[in-house]
Swiss-Prot record, chains A, B, C, D, E, F:
Subcellular localization: Cytoplasm
Enzyme superclass (EC): transferase
Signal peptide annotation: none
Record's catalysed reaction(s): (R)-4'-phosphopantetheine + ATP + H(+) = 3'-dephospho-CoA + diphosphate
Protein name as it appears in the record: Phosphopantetheine adenylyltransferase
One GO cellular component, as annotated: cytoplasm
Any GO BP annotation: coenzyme A biosynthetic process
Encoding gene (name): coaD
Amino acid sequence: MAEVKPVTAVFPGTFDPFTRGHFSLVMRGIKTFHKVIVAVAGSTSKNTKFSLEERVDMAKRIFEHHPQVEVDSFDGLLVHYVEQSPANVIMRGLRAVSDFEYEFQMALMNRRLDNDIQTVFLMTDYKWMYLSSSIIKDVAVNGGDIKGLVPRQIYDEVIERLVPGK
Amino acid sequence: MAEVKPVTAVFPGTFDPFTRGHFSLVMRGIKTFHKVIVAVAGSTSKNTKFSLEERVDMAKRIFEHHPQVEVDSFDGLLVHYVEQSPANVIMRGLRAVSDFEYEFQMALMNRRLDNDIQTVFLMTDYKWMYLSSSIIKDVAVNGGDIKGLVPRQIYDEVIERLVPGK
Amino acid sequence: MAEVKPVTAVFPGTFDPFTRGHFSLVMRGIKTFHKVIVAVAGSTSKNTKFSLEERVDMAKRIFEHHPQVEVDSFDGLLVHYVEQSPANVIMRGLRAVSDFEYEFQMALMNRRLDNDIQTVFLMTDYKWMYLSSSIIKDVAVNGGDIKGLVPRQIYDEVIERLVPGK
Amino acid sequence: MAEVKPVTAVFPGTFDPFTRGHFSLVMRGIKTFHKVIVAVAGSTSKNTKFSLEERVDMAKRIFEHHPQVEVDSFDGLLVHYVEQSPANVIMRGLRAVSDFEYEFQMALMNRRLDNDIQTVFLMTDYKWMYLSSSIIKDVAVNGGDIKGLVPRQIYDEVIERLVPGK
Amino acid sequence: MAEVKPVTAVFPGTFDPFTRGHFSLVMRGIKTFHKVIVAVAGSTSKNTKFSLEERVDMAKRIFEHHPQVEVDSFDGLLVHYVEQSPANVIMRGLRAVSDFEYEFQMALMNRRLDNDIQTVFLMTDYKWMYLSSSIIKDVAVNGGDIKGLVPRQIYDEVIERLVPGK
Amino acid sequence: MAEVKPVTAVFPGTFDPFTRGHFSLVMRGIKTFHKVIVAVAGSTSKNTKFSLEERVDMAKRIFEHHPQVEVDSFDGLLVHYVEQSPANVIMRGLRAVSDFEYEFQMALMNRRLDNDIQTVFLMTDYKWMYLSSSIIKDVAVNGGDIKGLVPRQIYDEVIERLVPGK
């Protein structure tokens, strides 16, 4: 039987910080593909609370015991990064209609830039459908309890950064 | 190196008739997964123009020269069919917001019925974003030209059924 | 100066019955174009409360004193009707997102059938944003007051048909 | 202190059958209002699996131990029913965008019929965001497991009706 | 008869400035609940044209003759403010789909922070469906007429601030 | 025959830079109206990559050989500009749902400011449905190929500004 080439998907994002919604998507990703590369975006128009190194380091600790998950970082165009990686699939999460439209636009532009890279959408668990990095930062900065909304491995450092001295 | 298990996705639908939009999704599917099973739904609340046998036969002729594509049919719950197939992924196409909501509801129900089956969405080519089996039937029945909207292998029989004697 | 060709737009619909929302769109249409042809659809999958003749007759009485408005009927494909009319514009009303998606699909298919016919969308007055022929029939049949929701010229006959003997 | 008039809300629906999503909305309703009247719609264009009497009886058993909840039935226009009830609020559930548009249209028409009746929307628990009576019937009829999707008091009779002899 | 506890709803917002849309929502709120607390948000990421004191003062003057309406201000998390107020209901206005998604996300996060606080949505009058504080500021700053878009009690000071010397 | 007054539409935008999507809309505009005025917005909250003069100059070169197209610029309110122009129609492009809502709000506000100015929406070609000035700038700045996404007359200067020295 011809040797089966593993399917690798890139899961790109700013991950500022990494949330339980992101984590649930990666878990569904490794049930769908052989390998998922969590690709942390370096250049982003958003001013982030955590540096690129910190965001990469947090992701590595979260997936320490998941051999199907790799963590990397990239700058510039996502499509250029995927082209020089072993992947030919971009994996994105869908939560609601407004996600859909933005993702649709990005996926069609990426397809124009490289028609051989497929964008595939997975749905977050409904438990995390309202969750985003920005709403977590908003709640934490205003004294709200974000326990359980970020993976436990990074909870303390996220609180320390967002609510110094808490 | 541990033997890599091929990734198989089920692409379910009524396919009454099969459109160029469906075809473009399957082509993107086999660039993403090792194998795609086109699963033609037997039991459907819609009264179809083509019988189940005809719809299965048309799909088989369309993908005759595509070894990565299998054609099958199923009755009852999609999730039950996938459970006894080699696949653990359901592949669906997304065209617009209204698709999104219906698909979201179905995917969450399927996930409740079997949390190990992942629903994955791909986007049709923008050329076919307006295309659906029902709009093709509507146009053909009213004397419109549907050339190029269904795969050429089945154009004559689709016209013959929708516009007898044309 | 070269002679200016008047711009004519076709405003197609089932108009079962004609509503104040339809009327407000036609009024905005004749402020935009030189002439508007209200084209009443003969063949429709919906079973209508009023026959084609009745719907055409009602529209004619409503626009009796509006020289910029013509009333006609058509069967089969809208695009075929427009092609043999003096118009090259199809005028449609937009009320909400779900309208938008259906209209988007129809407009792209019509554009595929004849790229020289432009579909143009106008917005109903916000007063009529919730109004549709079907919600009017629903309310009237259940004894609700639809005064002011259909043009006064046709109020009596609409009530007589929907709530016989009222 | 002037005597406080209790706030009563009418929660209308076909409830064919009553789902856990409906139940979670009523529970949130009685935390918001003093009393909730579950008003089962008699006249409906949908052909129901359960008669009006059966649907009323099921709702009564579900809320047997909830003094803040009353069960009633109505025919004709919802607004006319609310006008002769102690309520001046209509309570509706929102799950997703497509709900939103339909509800928006109904609420604006109801407001036109009686500006003193307020329509108020509550959000279902995210656990039930994909749930509807029709998707439950669809799954059950096709042999799927709907345990936990309808209140336990009515599970047996719902299964018996949808999958006779199971 | 057991003493009826009045239902109080908190209507939070930046109100920069207060609009006729906001006013119409509060009017519908006091037809639904016994008391509405207009809670002006202190901490906001948006840089406001009016200080917190000015926004609170304007709201107080607008509702001077409405005993069912109280005006207050809050900082930090809305849920924390509601918890120490007599209210257990958050009242929000819905205008269109994009509102819906943002509100949905906020309401689900608030529910996670305190499951006993219910978020309830009312619909603005269709007259104000296009109105927002930002579009009013945009129009006024560019010399447009905003008469009738803000309550008359605050029109002069809003114009004076947005178009000094007009 | 009474002399026919030509129909002129204003097509307003920031055009930073002008895209093939904008171009395709203007081409459909001159098939619908006698004349289209491309009105480049001076005052805009967005910080643009090209000055107003550069944006006007680029548009003029693009439509050099199109006598039905005029290029102008305006400051302040669009409605005020249209009122002193020969046009009584504002022409806007619709790509997706999120466009729709923003456009809906703007059109209703413009209608409030001047009920005699009609806003009319045309749909971009599906080829450009994902295209916007901002996504083009984003891709170009990150080294992506934007050939064919802006009219060829302005490609070199757009690249020179976005990727100096390329």
